[in-house]
């Protein structure tokens, strides 16, 4: 999320950044870095899995910024467990943030974009939604849901001047992914499966996100773009 925020700021986007209350410090640090590019940047706390909080966040964003031209749904969590022993709360929490959170943000922002006659929606899924891994069934299901949701959404909002697209990052060295990738054996195994023979950096996702959030993608909708260094080829 931070790399996307700073990358969009570098490209001239004004930003509304969001995170949960527990990450307030990190959120404000990111906002401060983004403002250094001369952009207008605000930071709003909200849990995307809570409808009331999402609606309040969107209302505040419109009140402060006047419009919402693009949305990037990037919130996500991962809690590892095999299917047989997966606690119900693991399943629920992952689905709530990854899938329902995307839905709730889109649902809240659509009236704004419809009134504008313009909007760009970029949902972040994962290559895990296409090629699952052991102990990630609930994560894989949540990201597959995001892809399916995006395809239907694109059909519904296309006539309104709104596009909806999806990005599937591969193995990226984020804070969430670092837990496993710090193990050289695991990291090297993923590199061996990737055509470009390296682990992705968060900055690798920025360009595709910027494309889907701009008029460069004006006639592109309902698409899922793999940003994975070629891991789908393995």
Q: Where do the model's predicted regions map?
A:
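Short-chain dehydrogenase/reductase
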Residues: 1-65, 70, 79, 89-90
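Active-site loop immediately N-terminal to the catalytic Tyr-X3-Lys motif
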Residues: 81-84, 131-137, 159-160, 197, ...
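Substrate-binding pocket helix/loop in short-chain dehydrogenase/reductase
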Residues: 82-83, 87-92, 186, 190
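Active-site helix of classical SDR
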Residues: 106, 142, 150
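Alpha-helical segment proximal to the catalytic Tyr-Lys
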Residues: 111, 155-159, 218
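Residue(s) in the substrate-gating loop at a strand-loop-helix junction
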Residues: 126
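Short C-terminal tail/terminal secondary-structure segment
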Residues: 130-134, 210, 221-234
């Amino acid at each position: 999320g931070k790399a996307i925020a700073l990358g969009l700021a570098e490209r001239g986007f004004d930003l509304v950044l969001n995170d949960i209350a527990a990450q307030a410090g990190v959120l404000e640090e990111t906002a401060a870095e983004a403002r250094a590019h001369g952009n207008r940047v605000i930071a709003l706390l909200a849990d995307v899995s809570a409808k009331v909080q999402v609606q309040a966040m969107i209302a505040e964003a419109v009140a402060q910024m006047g419009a919402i031209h693009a949305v990037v749904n990037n919130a996500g969590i991962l809690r590892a467990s095999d299917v047989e022993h997966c606690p119900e709360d693991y399943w629920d929490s992952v689905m709530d943030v990854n899938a329902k959170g995307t839905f709730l943000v889109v649902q809240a922002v659509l009236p704004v974009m419809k009134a504008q006659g313009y909007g760009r929606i970029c949902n972040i899924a994962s290559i895990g939604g296409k090629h699952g891994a052991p102990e990630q069934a609930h994560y894989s299901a949540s990201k597959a849901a995001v892809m399916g949701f995006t395809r239907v959404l694109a059909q519904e909002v296309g006539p309104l001047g709104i596009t909806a697209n999806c990005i599937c990052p591969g193995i990226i060295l984020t804070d969430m992914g670092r837990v496993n990738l710090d193990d050289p054996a695991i990291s090297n195994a993923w590199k061996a499966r990737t055509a470009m023979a390296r682990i992705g950096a968060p900055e690798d996702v920025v360009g595709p996100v910027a494309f889907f959030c701009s008029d460069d993608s004006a006639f592109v909708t309902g698409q899922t773009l793999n940003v994975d260094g070629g891991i789908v080829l393995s």
